[in-house]
Amino acid sequence: MTSHRAQRPSPDEYPSFYAGYVSQVPDGDVVEALIGGAEIAAALLHDLDEERGDHAYAPGKWTLKEVLLHCADAERIFVYRALRIARGDQTPLPGWDENAYAPLSGAGARSMDSIMDELESVREGSVTLFHGLPEDAWTRTGNANGKPITVRALAWITAGHLLHHLGVVQERYLG
């Protein structure tokens, strides 16, 4: 029997909005994909200077530092949802406004090193949670932002969200 964490979630396990994130994740064990995403981030973003971190590729767009803190914020929210649902909590979980969070993140006052440390720490916590889940938790369904979603889908969304943003960073901030 294949582990639930190695099975890509079916489209009925998550809102269609997240399909692009799920599709970013390579086939196989999603915990390994989470680890791989952290390695990609470290390789891509190591040794970037502060000027690069404070750069936005267009007026009204987030700076690189804001993008990275958005990734940390989103991951915390996805993983919090996964924890609640994995533990059988059926409380509907609210949505959140990423565009309201970014300007309040304090990204401009932080160093790239501190932001990278935070992103790495958040990812380590995510890996630890998902690695330790019992097999039956992966298929539990809860409600987030008014829509049904499974723990498995949240793991794949978590992995794919960072990969998506690393692609944007490569193309628009570093390219």
Question: What annotation goes with each model-predicted range?
Answer:
Residues 1-12, 17-20, 54-98, 124-127, ...:
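Short, contiguous alpha-helical
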Residues 16-32:
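Short, charged, low-complexity loops and linkers
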Residues 23-27, 105-109, 147-151:
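A short, mixed-charge helix-start or loop-turn motif at secondary-structure junctions
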Residues 26, 49, 134-135:
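Residues that cap or delimit alpha-helices
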Residues 27-38, 61, 65-68, 112-116, ...:
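Amphipathic, non-membrane alpha-helical segments in soluble helical-bundle scaffolds
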Residues 32-44, 101-139:
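Acidic/histidine-rich alpha-helical segments that form the ligand environment
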Residues 34-62:
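A glycine-rich, hydrophobic loop/mini-helix early in the fold
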